[in-house]
């Protein structure tokens, strides 16, 4: 997606892994592959930490364009900024919004050579019995609640009425160049980086809060290498019967590849484990 550029070469081998939270309340798995591309711009992060005695889960998918530099920077810095935020527990939405914006500002100030490099982000933060999903760009987040596929993020595309209006109000334009693009260049309307288009391509995340209860089964974060060829409902159906989230992530990746996805493919699956112990998720 986005700009075309030479990026990190890869041997084409998929990677996968996973883990379990210390409190046994959630497990996670990931799978990532360059797919049919010769280079890799996707990055992901899976982290379990502790803040004020609470077990915290942090998960993210970052799909770069114009190179891998911004996606790698966001992977390395976004969650560190978030965990250090003084309102991380008391006002998690504000902390997430601030962390997105400060990470973007720091990158733009630190590397003036990467004017046409950017990245999407789709992140999930587990705090107690709350799930916070935030995104910029088109790396989508889906939950399965009561067997139903529910999108908990909105793809930020330049042809959406509200996004196009925002861009034009800021003095920019949207035009068709194979797909709808900001300035005829970029296929997403919100992203990290993209210094030359920053006035129009903002990093304001949309944040959604969900309650972690017994109806919430699992979460999927993935780059558009999956969503270009697999529907939300298909992804949930494929994942629901696979208890091991790493195996579920691998299944999604393999299916996207089989369906001729032309992009890098990265999937993160988080499964919520509703045991017989404490009713809380801290």
UniProtKB/Swiss-Prot annotation:
GO terms for biological process: regulation of intracellular signal transduction. Residues 27-272 form the PPM-type phosphatase domain. Binds 2 magnesium or manganese ions per subunit. It comes from the Eukaryota. One of its GO terms (molecular function) is protein serine/threonine phosphatase activity. Its EC number is 3.1.3.16. It is an enzyme of class 3 (hydrolase). Mn(2+) 1 binds at residues 63-64. It catalyses: O-phospho-L-seryl-[protein] + H2O = L-seryl-[protein] + phosphate; O-phospho-L-threonyl-[protein] + H2O = L-threonyl-[protein] + phosphate. Keywords: Hydrolase, Magnesium, Manganese, Metal-binding, Protein phosphatase. Its cofactor is Mg(2+); Mn(2+). Disulfide bonds: none annotated. This is Probable protein phosphatase 2C 45. It comes from Oryza sativa subsp. japonica. The lineage of its organism: Eukaryota, Viridiplantae, Streptophyta, Embryophyta, Tracheophyta.
